[in-house]
Amino acid sequence: MHPELDLVYVGKIVGTHGVKGELKVISLTDIENRFNELDRVYLVNEQDHYDPIIAHIESSFTHKNMEIVKFSEWDDINQVEGFHDWYIKIPREERPQLEEDEYYFDQITGLSVVTVEDEFLGTVTNIYQTGSNDVYEVSKEQDDKPILIPALYEVVKKIDLDEQIMIVDLPEGLLDEEE
């Protein structure tokens, strides 16, 4: 892959739809109608490490919890069948600007987590979307049992992307329950 490209995931191609070159895509973003807002994207095959292919979105719509995406470069099912399990990516700088105190998952994953008392808890290794609020999985070492921290204003006091740190004020008993 071109080292100068800093690409982020927006979708995964999981199959074809119809015979006119449309593809079924699982959206990897929670931005509604994301593919309608995009023009140029990069198709990436991470298994075979091909260079990204630039493609242009002609149209997209939602069907049975899938995005159906049509690229202007291809008009036939035979031309797109090989894209199964490829990813759709865009340059990081083309992501929409978020509101204050909103972050992309890749900005949170990897942050060091410390308490307001300056105790190091570990690193954010995963984020779970539970419906009511996200939950951050924090691990010190690979084999340690992770701590699950609710992504609530009462708990997460500060996120500093420049310093790569999250400061939390854990509810009483949370660490005791996790151990």
UniProtKB/Swiss-Prot annotation:
Keywords: Chaperone, Cytoplasm, Ribosome biogenesis, rRNA processing. It is found in: Cytoplasm. Pfam families: PRC_RimM (PF24986), RimM (PF01782). GO terms for biological process: ribosomal small subunit biogenesis; rRNA processing. GO terms for cellular component: cytoplasm; ribosome. InterPro entries: PRC_barrel-like_sf, PRC_RimM, RimM, RimM_N, RimM_N_sf, Transl_B-barrel_sf. GO terms for molecular function: ribosome binding. It comes from the Bacteria. Residues 99-174 form the PRC barrel domain. An accessory protein needed during the final step in the assembly of 30S ribosomal subunit, possibly for assembly of the head region. Essential for efficient processing of 16S rRNA. May be needed both before and after RbfA during the maturation of 16S rRNA. It has affinity for free ribosomal 30S subunits but not for 70S ribosomes. Belongs to the RimM family. The PRC barrel domain binds ribosomal protein uS19. HAMAP family: Ribosome_mat_RimM. Binds ribosomal protein uS19. This is Ribosome maturation factor RimM. It comes from Natranaerobius thermophilus (strain ATCC BAA-1301 / DSM 18059 / JW/NM-WN-LF).
